[in-house]
Amino acid sequence: MSNESKCPFSGHNSKPQVTVGGGTANLHWWPNQLRVDLLNQHSERSNPLGKDFNYRQEFKKLDYYALKADIKNVLTDSQDWWPADWGNYTGLFIRLAWHAAGTYRMGDGRGGAGRGQQRFAPLNSWPDNASLDKARRLLWPVKQKYGQKISWADLFILAGNIALESSGFRTFGFGAGREDVWEPDNDVNWGDEKEWLAHRNSEALAGSNLAATEMGLIYVNPEGPQASGDPRSAAPFIRATFGNMAMDDEEIVALIAGGHTLGKTHGAAPADHVQADPEGAPIEQMGFGWANSYGTGVGKDAITSGLEVIWSQTPTQWSNYFFENLFKYEWVQERSPAGAIQWVAADAEAIIPDPFDPSIKRKPTMLTTDLTLRFDPEFEKISRRFLNDPQAFANAFARAWFKLTHRDMGPKARYLGPEVPTEDLIWQDPLPAASATPSSASIADAKAKIVALGLPAGELVSLAWASASTFRGGDKRGGANGARIALSPQREWEVNKKAVETLTKIEELKASTQLSLADLIVLAGNVGVEQAAQAAGFNITVPFAPGRVDALQSQTDVESFQLLLGLADGFRNWKKQGVNTPAEVLLIDKAQQLTLTAPELTALIGGLRVLGTNWDGSQHGVFTQQVGVLSTDFFTNLLDMSNVWAPVDSTSEVFEGKDRKSGTVKFTATRNDLVFGSNSILRALAEVYAQADGKEKFVQDFVAAWTKVMNLDRFDLA
C-alpha cells in the first residue's frame, strides 16, 4: 500500500476528515440535556441586516400597489421549469400562504407565518409542503426587486391574498409587519415521531399544542385517518387540528371549502418517482427538492401529494362550485394515478377542465376530508347553508382566511399597510385608544402615592411581573398593556392570588392619578425594584415608558386568554399540578416565550428570588437573610460549597440545603433554583454575579432585563 493511500488527509477516504459541528454531539450522551441554547436563537450574529435595521420603517418606503401589481403578473407568467396549471399559479400561491400560516397553534403561540420559517428546515422539506419550493422561487424576482422593503414572511401571505383577489374574490384585508428571521425556530416542538407521516390519535391532539395529525402534515391526512378513506372518522381529527388553531366549525368549513375552490392537487404517478426533499437534495439542485423522474416531471406529470383532484369547473375563478358539486353528486372511491384514495362523481358528466389540454374534460373529484363536510352532521348543516347562500360563504371564508393568516401577529398595532381592516376582532386582543401621555409631574405624583402605600418591594415587583409575564413572543399575545390581570380569567388564576391582593391596593390609587391601571402596575413594580436596589446600596432609576391603556372585559376572550397561563412560571416558582415535565425545562420554555437570553434569565431569577416573589409566599430559592434587598445572595449561597442539597421526597421537586458540617437546614429550593448550580451553562452565568465584583453588574443587568419584560408588548415604542 502506498503512503498516499494510507494518509488520512489524502482525499481518498470515503468519510469526510473534518466536519465542523460534526462528531458525536452532547445530546447523544445526555439526551435530556437542558436546551439553554434555545435562548440564544436569532441573535444579531445570525442577522445580516444588523441591529439598526427597522422593518417597519423600511416597509413605509414601499410602493405597495406596485408590489401587488408585480405579484399579480407573476400569477400568469408561467415558467417552463414549473408550468402553471391553466396558465395560472393562483392555487399554488394560496397553498403557499395557507401552509406558511397553518403551522400556528394557539396553545403555546408558536408556529405560523410571522417569521418566514417556511424558508428553513424542517418546514421547507415537510412532505405536505412538497412543491412549495417552486412557489417561493417564483416569487424571488419580486423579492429581489423590492429588497428589504418587503419581508419573505409578508410576501408569502400577500401572494396568497393577491391570488384570491385575482380569482374575483374580495378578501377581508391584509396587514404587513411580519419580520424575517435567518435561521430555524428550534424551540417549536413538532412532535416526537421519528418518521414522516407517523399518525397521532385525535385525543392526543386535543390535549397538545400540535397542529397536525401526522408528522410533516399541516393539518390532516386528506385520505382520512391513516389513509382509511373514511370521511366520517376524519371529523374529530379535523376539529382537533383546526381547533388547536382557534378555529370553530364554521371557520373550518369555510377554510376547507374556500381553499379547495381554486387550483388542484398533483398525483400523476407513484411516489417512487420522487427524489429527495430540498434539505436532502444534491447541492446542484440549488435548494430545489422533490425532483420527479416521471415523464417531464412537471406540468401534467407533476407529483406533489399523490392525489389528482380538481374540485371546480372554474379552478382559477372564485365560485360556489365546491358546495354545488359536493351535494349534487354521488361520490365513489377511486385511486389516483399515484395510488392515493380519492373520490369521483360517478353520476357526473366530464365538466372539469384539464389544466394543460383544453380538449380534455374530467369528472369532478374530491378528497376524503372534503366529503367530511357533507357526511359529518354538524359540518353538513353549515355546508348546506353555504350552498344556499354563496355570499355568506364568501364572507365567512374572507374572515377565516384573514384570521388564519394573521392569528400569530398579535395586536392590530403591529399591522402595517393601506389594507388593514378598521374592524377590531376579538382574537386580536383589542385595546382602547390611548389618551394623552401622562406628564412627568403626574408620573412623579403617582410614584409618590405608590411609595406612600408602604408595601414591601417584593409585593410591588410580584404584581408587575404577574401582569407583564403573560407575554408570548410566538404570537405576541399577553403582556402588561391592557392590565388584563384585573380581568377574568387572569384575576382568578391561582398563581396570581397574592398579586391580586396587591392589585386591589393599586386599583384604589387609580382615581387619584392620571395614569392608567396598566401604567400604575408597571410603575409600582419599578418602584419596588428601585427600593430594593437602594437597599443594596445602588441609587438607580428604572426606565418607565407611559402610554399603556386598560382593556375592557368585553375586549377579552376568556377562553383564549386562559391559554396564556401556561404550565408553569418558574420565575415565581409556580407549576401547574399534574404536569410531569421537569420544572427547569418549563422555565426555559417560559424564558424563551419572554424572548430572554440566558444571561437575562439568570439575572431575573436571582433578583426575583431575593425580593421574595414566589407565588405562594414560600421560601424556596430565597437564599438570603435580607429579603427585599437586590443583592447577589441567591448566587453566592447557591454556589457555596458549605451547603449540601438533597430532595425532600421521591418526586425530587423540592430540596433542602443543609450545612455540610452541622446538618442544619439553611434553605429550601425547587428545580428552578438548583438548575443554576447544576447546569454547566447556567452555573457559568451565575458565577459572574456571585463574584466579588458582580454586585453592581447584577443590579444593572436585572434592571435592563426587568425593563425589557415590562415593555415586551409596547409595540408603539418600536
Curated annotation (Swiss-Prot):
Site (Transition state stabilizer): R95
GO MF assignments: catalase activity; heme binding; metal ion binding
Superkingdom, natural source: Bacteria
Residue(s) of cross-link: Tryptophyl-tyrosyl-methioninium (Trp-Tyr) (with M-245): W98-Y219
Parts of the chain that traverse the membrane: none
Catalytic activity annotation: H2O2 + AH2 = A + 2 H2O; 2 H2O2 = O2 + 2 H2O
Co-factor(s): heme b
Cross-link (Tryptophyl-tyrosyl-methioninium (Tyr-Met) (with W-98)): Y219-M245
Keyword check for Metal-binding: yes
Entry binding sites for heme b: H260
Enzymatic class: oxidoreductase
Cofactor: how bound: Binds 1 heme b (iron(II)-protoporphyrin IX) group per dimer.
Its EC number(s): 1.11.1.21
Iron listed as a keyword: yes
Family: Belongs to the peroxidase family. Peroxidase/catalase subfamily.
Subunit structure comment from the entry: Homodimer or homotetramer.
Annotated function: Bifunctional enzyme with both catalase and broad-spectrum peroxidase activity.
Protein name listed in UniProt: Catalase-peroxidase
